[in-house]
């Protein structure tokens, strides 16, 4: 963690000291963030002993502090909102427990490039050319949203929050095959909801976002995303009309369609298997399963 000044460090320490009280009083004791335990003062001491990692907990809280420029009031509000949302939405279930429509597997993919530049090693791909072919999937927006959040959570599992070279994700939005279509209102509504969720509940996790094969007809999409985000995030956006130029930015991406160095595998073959949840995430999922049985 790198603080710009003593004031930032003071705010961080105050927030971290308040964390157990916030979790107890404002979050119904729910303390899981991206699969990691936050409450170092849990009354269930065995849980702290088994699952608490102070370095990771501090790294995650630091990210939220950084996202809100060390504004204490905003940080507290964000922590409470995030934990309460996670308790109600249950993104761990979306990532590891639920069975999603098989067709969605062609819409969103996850790749891992351990030898690439810092923070370009975990990449989520959104293939809008596939989306327009499967508009029926968006009749029930909640199903797509749960799938997309699940994909995000699985990507987070591949990050190392103690490693500055791999504690952010990169995203690719590919619009190949969309030039002759306009995304209909249901797809737009889903997109808008997902953007809002990422902005509010996943702060300071995006390193870069590449928009590739973007036809002028879809300029609304880029404008929509810009309207939801702050200036710092907008600086992370790169628009490429030619998808084959992506290899200049993500060297390990497939040579096919994207101009990367991997000539053996296309994007579908690069798609990684579902990673194993963190030990604490497994504990929570097992506890939920036992409650369901009861």
Swiss-Prot record:
Q: Which cofactors are reported in the record for this sequence?
A: heme b
The cross-references to SUPFAM superfamilies, in alphabetical order and at most eight, read:
CRAL/TRIO domain
Q: Which compartment or compartments is the protein found in? A: Cytoplasm; Endoplasmic reticulum membrane; Microsome membrane
Tell me which residues make up the CRAL-TRIO domain.
97-266
Q: Which residues bind heme?
A: 128, 148, 173, 175, 209
Q: How does it sit in the membrane?
A: Peripheral membrane protein
Which key words tag this protein in UniProt?
Answer: Cytoplasm, Endoplasmic reticulum, Heme, Iron, Lipid transport, Membrane, Metal-binding, Microsome, Transport
Q: Which reaction does it catalyse?
A: a 1,2-diacyl-sn-glycero-3-phospho-(1D-myo-inositol)(in) = a 1,2-diacyl-sn-glycero-3-phospho-(1D-myo-inositol)(out)
Name one molecular function that GO assigns to this entry: metal ion binding
Naming one, the record's GO cellular component terms include: plasma membrane
**Which Pfam family, any one of them, does this sequence belong to?**
CRAL_TRIO
Q: Does the keyword Cell division apply?
A: no
| GO BP annotation list | Golgi to plasma membrane protein transport; phosphatidylinositol metabolic process; regulation of establishment of cell polarity; regulation of exocytosis
Record PROSITE patterns = CRAL_TRIO
Q: Which family does it belong to?
A: Belongs to the SFH5 family.
Q: What does this protein do?
A: Non-classical phosphatidylinositol (PtdIns) transfer protein (PITP), which exhibits PtdIns-binding/transfer activity in the absence of detectable PtdCho-binding/transfer activity. Regulates PtdIns(4,5)P2 homeostasis at the plasma membrane. Heme-binding protein that may play a role in organic oxidant-induced stress responses.
- This one is known as Phosphatidylinositol transfer protein SFH5
User: Which species is the source of this protein?
Assistant: Vanderwaltozyma polyspora (strain ATCC 22028 / DSM 70294 / BCRC 21397 / CBS 2163 / NBRC 10782 / NRRL Y-8283 / UCD 57-17) (Kluyveromyces polysporus)
Q: Read off the lineage from the record.
A: Eukaryota, Fungi, Dikarya, Ascomycota, Saccharomycotina
Gene designation per UniProt? SFH5
